[in-house]
């Protein structure tokens, strides 16, 4: 600012020896504030304005820039601290963290539903349980055994995801009616994404099986691949799920035969390098899971009867009705539990006898009690009971290693 121009009367008031300032009249002019020379040009000055006598507070606001019209809001740039002295996360940081984790969480949730976790858990438990049948003493539980078991479980889970993913790819329209929350049916995954996922998991399964070098393991993966593909893919002479009998046979072959025999032989012959033998517990596991696999094959279509009827899938539930198929499934399972109790009672091992008899009796009682209270007109109740059947499936694989 080059100059500050004041009125002569004010300059006189500032002179030494000046007596006193005359009182300001209400119609007095405010002095021009300033004039600024910029680059040698004409000075720019604020013009004087007429006022009706500003008050002291108004002058203070004017000269001190305290007017609310000129106040610049202050926003803290650093994060504050709470009473304990710990820094609090700013809202911007919280928003950034949320924006990062939300898509990751959504992707994981979609893949979780795509993988059909109840089948993944069943596959893992069955392989671990059957592999333990090859263990003869505690020294067999070695790093070699654990490595062979892990290789088998991972390869089988990859193949499991391929099979359930392929089924969803060819059932998109049906699942929009029966299972609208699945990612392909809901539109979260595009068909191209589904193709990429099932192709990747099939390749990883075969790649791991080939790298391990176990003939029983690779054979189990290959047969599961063939049956799973034929079950779902919509090509001439395939899509075996359209036939209730053939669909049940596919599930029975994988769940009851391949899982029990192939993975037992993988541990017995490839890991332990022992001759192939079919023990009493292995025969029991195969026979019991034959019943259980038939039940799963029949029961899984009960909640899906609406979509199956629309798209021409001739399941037993469509042909016979939900109620009749439901009680057939319950009867088959109760029969299997009775056989298991009788077999446990004939065991020469005392602890095995008690464990198998009491365990299967408890499961049979729970099944009967639950089946009597179900509302067969409610799809939600039927779906919940189907998941209960899978829990019984898991429990059986906890009992199988105790059979001796």
From Swiss-Prot:
Comp. bias intervals (Polar residues): 76-92
UniProt-listed Pfam families: UbiA (PF01040)
EC supergroup of this enzyme: transferase
Transit sequence range: 1-77
InterPro entries membership: AtHST-like (IPR044502), UbiA_prenyltransferase (IPR000537), UbiA_sf (IPR044878)
PANTHER family: HOMOGENTISATE PHYTYLTRANSFERASE 1, CHLOROPLASTIC, HOMOGENTISATE SOLANESYLTRANSFERASE, CHLOROPLASTIC
Family: Belongs to the UbiA prenyltransferase family.
Protein purpose: Involved in the synthesis of tocopherol (vitamin E). Catalyzes the condensation of homogentisate and phytyl diphosphate to form dimethylphytylhydroquinone.
Protein name according to UniProt: Probable homogentisate phytyltransferase 1, chloroplastic
Organism: Oryza sativa subsp. japonica
């Amino acid at each position: 600012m080059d100059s500050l121009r004041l009125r002569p009367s004010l300059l006189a008031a500032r002179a030494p020896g000046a007596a006193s300032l005359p009182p300001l009249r209400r119609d007095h002019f405010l002095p021009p504030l300033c004039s600024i020379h910029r680059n040698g040009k004409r000075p720019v000055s604020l013009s004087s304005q007429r006022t009706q006598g500003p008050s002291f507070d108004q002058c203070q606001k004017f000269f001190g820039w305290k007017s609310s019209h000129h106040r610049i809001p202050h926003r803290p740039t650093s994060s504050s601290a709470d009473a304990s002295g710990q820094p609090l996360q700013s809202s911007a940081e919280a928003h950034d963290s949320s924006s990062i984790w939300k898509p990751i969480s959504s992707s994981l949730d979609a893949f979780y539903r795509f993988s059909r976790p109840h089948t993944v858990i069943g596959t893992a438990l069955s392989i671990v349980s059957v592999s333990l049948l090859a263990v003869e003493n505690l020294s067999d539980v070695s790093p070699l055994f654990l490595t062979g078991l892990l290789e088998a479980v991972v390869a089988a889970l990859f193949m499991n995801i391929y099979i359930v993913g392929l089924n969803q790819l060819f059932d998109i329209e049906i699942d929009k009616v029966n299972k609208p929350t699945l990612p392909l049916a809901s539109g979260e995954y595009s068909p191209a994404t589904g193709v990429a996922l099932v192709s990747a998991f099939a390749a990883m399964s075969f790649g791991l099986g080939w790298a391990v070098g176990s003939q029983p393991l690779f054979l189990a993966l290959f047969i599961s691949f063939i049956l799973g593909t034929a079950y779902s893919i919509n090509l001439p002479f395939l899509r075996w799920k359209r036939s209730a009998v053939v669909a049940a046979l596919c599930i029975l072959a994988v769940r009851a035969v391949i899982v029990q025999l192939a993975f037992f032989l993988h541990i017995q012959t490839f890991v332990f390098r022992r001759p192939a033998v079919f023990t009493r517990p292995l025969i029991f596991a195969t026979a019991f899971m034959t019943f259980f696999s038939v039940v799963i094959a029949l029961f899984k279509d009960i909640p899906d009867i609406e979509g199956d009827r629309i798209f021409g899938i001739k399941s037993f539930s469509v042909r016979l009705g939900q109620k009749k198929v439901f009680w057939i499934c319950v009867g088959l399972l109760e029969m299997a539990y009775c056989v298991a109790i009788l077999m446990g009672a004939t065991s020469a091992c005392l602890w095995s006898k008690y464990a198998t008899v009491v365990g299967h009796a408890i499961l049979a009682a729970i099944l009967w009690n639950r089946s009597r209270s179900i509302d067969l007109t409610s799809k939600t109740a039927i779906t919940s009971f189907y998941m209960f059947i899978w829990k019984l499936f898991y429990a059986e694989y906890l009992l199988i290693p105790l059979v001796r």
